[in-house]
Amino acid sequence: VCYTIENKNRGSTTKLCGAAHPNNGGLLLKNYFSLSMQPREINQISALGLAHCGDAVFELLVRSWLCDSGKLTTKQLHRATVSYVCAPAQAARADRMLPLLTEDELAQYKRGRNAHVHMIPKNATHEQYSKATGLECLFGALYLSGRLERINELFVLTMEEPHAD
């Protein structure tokens, strides 16, 4: 079922397609905030494709975490976000996350870590960038499989400050 929505103010139209809702015949759009892909579907996506998605997931979590942690100016929010999502910081978090991973999660992490990337930012080593890509690949796979609680658990545990023993 497809519907055409006309925006009279802008003079444009948008075509929306989805399944007809069984109760009222209305349009039921796919919810991209709540996906539940099967492992075989996720394995068909390249490691860098998963990392692309996971990069956005991780950044959204960092931004949410920063907004929740107190009042900061937009400039402070931006600088803090950049400091947490850069490859060296993600690599450090990946190192802290590794002991917490299941066998399947570790396989997804390694898939991303071992992916061949063509460009590495100047502020990161090859090893740091590979670890960051592994973290992003894992977060992308977990997000697409609908395992949001697990993403949150890993995120919270890796954002805690390390304890000096």
What is each model feature region?
Residues C2-D165:
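Double-stranded RNA-binding/processing signature
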